[in-house]
Amino acid sequence: MRALALFVTALWAATVAPASADGSRLDAIVERHVLRVGTTGDYRPFTALDKGTGEYSGFDIDMARALAKALGVSIAFAPTTWSGLAQGLAEGDFDIAMGVSVTLDRQKIGFFSAPYLRDGKTPIARCSDQEKFQTLTDIDRPGVKVIANPGGTNERFDRARLHAADIVVYPDNLTIFDQLASGRADLMITDASETRFQAKLHPGVLCAIHPDQPFDFAEKAYWMVPDPALKAFVDQWLHLAIEDGEFDALFAKWFR
């Protein structure tokens, strides 16, 4: 984590911008006393919604609460979906989305914070089948069923890289790994961080396949409306959270 901290510190120093005199989203958040956070609630360990209680939990939920505390405001979670995330940000349904993969298409719509996690797409499969699906060539064969949640970077990766395999779109990302465990699909290609977590939830049943050597490079960051003042605050807060140990403590809670 120290190497990541140094990288974030350097990037923060290069990107900090002064707050605008008036009319910034940061000012609006402080004036309304509420930070609105967009979250899908279906991406453990980053965000998960308990449908019984209506409560959210996860690493990015804890980080969002820490950000709201730093701002001196309360927090309101705005439910969204992966397919509706960009529209929600563009239309102002929320101020910031937590735990989002950095892409250039998303950069066109809003600002990203300094990245806080290196990631990448890698397979997860039943442990008995893990040797079958080591490479994209192994996976991209007729008859192989690759399950994906709709509208996010997982489905986009599959459709860009797989041409012979059968891509099965499943709408509920909270139960999608149960579909995999029960044999309704052969594998899923998702973020390495998620494969590690799901393998721990399904010991001996699901196995993360080479999560330390994913198929591509990706980073997680916080995605916000394009306001320089808000970005400067978020980057400064993240920098301090990494340096004072708050980030590491929350990361250990959810990932170790």
Where are these regions (language model features)?
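Short helix-initiation/N-cap motifs at beta->coil->alpha
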Residues: 61, 77-87, 168-182, 216-218
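Bacterial N-terminal signal peptides
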Residues: 5-15
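A conserved helix-loop-strand patch within extracytoplasmic ligand-binding domains
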Residues: 73-84, 101-106, 114-155, 159-161
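Periplasmic-binding protein-like
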Residues: 106, 118-125, 192, 196-239, ...
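Extracytoplasmic small-molecule ligand-binding "clamshell" domains
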Residues: 21-100, 108
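Ligand-binding clefts/hinges and TM-proximal coupling segments of bilobed small-molecule sensing domains
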Residues: 22-24, 153-170, 207-211, 238-256
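A ligand-binding cleft/hinge motif common to bilobed small-molecule-binding domains
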Residues: 84-87, 101-109, 157-160, 181-216
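Extended ligand-binding regions for polar small-molecule ligands
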Residues: 61-70, 128-129, 137-143, 152, ...
